[in-house]
């Protein structure tokens, strides 16, 4: 399961830029990867983890702007098509031989 966060935050004033930076750092520290500008995604273990991370997002929302969340299954996420550009390093497929178990 994946949780995708889409946001559009104002960056007009110094306080706006600070709120943007604080929210973006929260996402990165909470395990989200940037998919593209203002779109971040995170792998989840199931609906319990989705609820937990939704609560964490709600607790760290900026006061202004627009923030949206979409939770999709791994199969739905894998069916996403990249139309222009190259896949990010995090998006490259890993086969069973490349996985190391400790």
Swiss-Prot record:
Gene (name only): cas2
Keyword annotations of the record: Antiviral defense, Endonuclease, Hydrolase, Magnesium, Metal-binding, Nuclease
CDD domains listed in its UniProt record: Cas2_I_II_III
Complexes and interactors: Homodimer, forms a heterotetramer with a Cas1 homodimer.
Domain of life of the source: Bacteria
Record-listed E.C. numbers: 3.1.-.-
Binding, Mg(2+): 8
Chain's role: CRISPR (clustered regularly interspaced short palindromic repeat), is an adaptive immune system that provides protection against mobile genetic elements (viruses, transposable elements and conjugative plasmids). CRISPR clusters contain sequences complementary to antecedent mobile elements and target invading nucleic acids. CRISPR clusters are transcribed and processed into CRISPR RNA (crRNA). Functions as a ssRNA-specific endoribonuclease. Involved in the integration of spacer DNA into the CRISPR cassette.
A GO molecular function held by the record: metal ion binding
Species name: Acidovorax ebreus (strain TPSY)
Matching NCBIfam families: cas2 (TIGR01573)
Keyword S-adenosyl-L-methionine applies: no
Transmembrane segments: none
Protein family per UniProt: Belongs to the CRISPR-associated endoribonuclease Cas2 protein family.
Annotated GO biological process: defense response to virus; maintenance of CRISPR repeat elements
Protein name (database record): CRISPR-associated endoribonuclease Cas2
Cofactor(s), by name: Mg(2+)
